[in-house]
Amino acid sequence: VFCTNADITEMYLNLEKSDEHDAPALVGVDATTKQQEAIRNGEEIGCVSQQPYAMGYQTIWAAVETTAPKKSVVIEKNVLSNPAWIDADCLDDPDYSGYLYTE
């Protein structure tokens, strides 16, 4: 099962499953705390995640730039945030800590 966002992934994780051995493989999006736990215990294979802090930073910076008095700026409409695959092998790797959501 591929879940297209964190909310859908968490809804799937909350579903009652009849037999854990027959549960379909799950791949999610965004490494929320609940998903990190699911990856650790094998409920979720892994997820594609972006860097939440960097995304927020870029958003605030764009807002500041557009409100600067008498300054002409060009704001990129789409900014690639270099997504990463997060699974049990890299979940605790410090290089991937920027991709993990904390709540």
Predicted features and spans:
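Hydrophobic alpha-helical
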Residues: 1-37
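Sec-exported extracytoplasmic/periplasmic mature domains
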Residues: 13-17, 40, 44, 61-68
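Short, charged, surface-exposed secondary-structure boundary motifs
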Residues: 35-39, 56-59
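Short beta-strand elements at the ligand-binding edges of bilobed clamshell
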Residues: 41-53
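Hinge/cleft segment of the Venus flytrap/periplasmic-binding protein
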Residues: 51-103
